[in-house]
């Protein structure tokens, strides 16, 4: 992202830290629940289409081009941020559309200690 957009995003967080923290907390909670619909809903309200294209969708397409050949050869673990998991342009959908089997890894996320 251009530095001007990064700065604007940072300034929004500084101007409204409670809102930024609440949005972050909601996203983390949805991620821990593996609630993809909630993640998609939260992200749709937090980022515009142009931002999502640059930060999520273009990167998902680039990763797909690299991952598909590798995943056809062997099993691969892919770890990405929550925004890359959802929607019609999400990484799991793109990989499935390429004929690959995709499944989440089970387990529970550890809660961070308070005050750290």
What would you call each of these model-derived segments?
Residues 75-115:
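C-terminal structured interaction module
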Residues 2-72, 90, 106-108, 112-115:
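Hydrophobic, often amphipathic alpha-helical segments used for membrane interaction and targeting
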């Amino acid at each position: 992202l251009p530095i001007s957009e990064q700065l604007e995003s940072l300034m929004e967080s500084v101007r409204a830290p409670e809102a930024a923290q609440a949005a972050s907390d909601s996203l983390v909670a949805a991620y821990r629940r593996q609630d993809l619909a909630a993640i998609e809903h939260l992200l749709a309200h937090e980022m515009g289409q142009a931002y999502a294209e640059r930060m999520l969708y273009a990167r998902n397409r680039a990763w797909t081009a690299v991952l598909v050949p590798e995943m056809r050869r062997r099993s691969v673990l892919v770890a990405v941020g929550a925004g890359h998991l959802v929607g019609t342009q999400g990484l799991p959908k793109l990989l499935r559309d390429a004929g690959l089997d995709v499944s989440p890894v089970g387990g529970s996320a550890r809660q961070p200690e308070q005050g750290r």
